[in-house]
Design a protein with these regions (language model features):
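Conserved catalytic core of nucleotide-sugar-dependent glycosyltransferases
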Residues: 3-81
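Accessible peptide chain termini
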Residues: 1-2, 121
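C-terminal catalytic/acceptor-binding lobe
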Residues: 71-121
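Alpha-helical elements of Rossmann-like donor-binding domains used by nucleotide-donor carbohydrate transfer enzymes
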Residues: 2-6, 91-94
């Protein structure tokens, strides 16, 4: 229940990344080193301000690996024009000042199978 807990515990929570973790230090997408500066953490997750980060830690709109509240995502995506997932990711970039500033991820890598069994509400 770590994903659900992250959203319930923080009204500024915008996105939970299934891709990132505390050891992620190089962005293949941007071919550049990257660094996480956490706001806080618990035994399973880390939170950070995505507005203050670059590359992957500053981009909640990597849709293949992100979890959002349905209400937030519906609000944003309804204001986008797109034909496919790549178009949607690109158009969502216009919301890079969205007021919910917290992203979160698991501290350690978690297998997809474990997320389905353990963390799905």
């Amino acid at each position: 229940a770590a994903i659900v807990k992250s959203f319930k515990d923080d009204s500024n929570m915008f996105c939970f990344s299934l891709y990132l973790n505390k050891d992620f230090n190089f962005s293949k997408r941007y071919n550049s080193p990257t660094k996480l500066v956490p706001l806080n953490h618990d035994d399973k997750t880390i939170k950070w301000d995505w507005h203050k980060h670059y590359f992957d830690f500053g981009n909640p709109f990597l849709l293949e690996s992100s979890v959002f509240l349905k209400s937030d995502f519906k609000k944003l995506s309804s204001k986008c024009q797109f034909n496919d997932i790549d178009d949607l990711e690109a158009d969502l970039q216009k919301f890079n000042t969205f007021p919910k500033f917290v992203m979160s991820c698991f501290k350690e890598n978690v297998k997809k199978e474990d997320i389905k069994e353990t963390y799905q509400p």
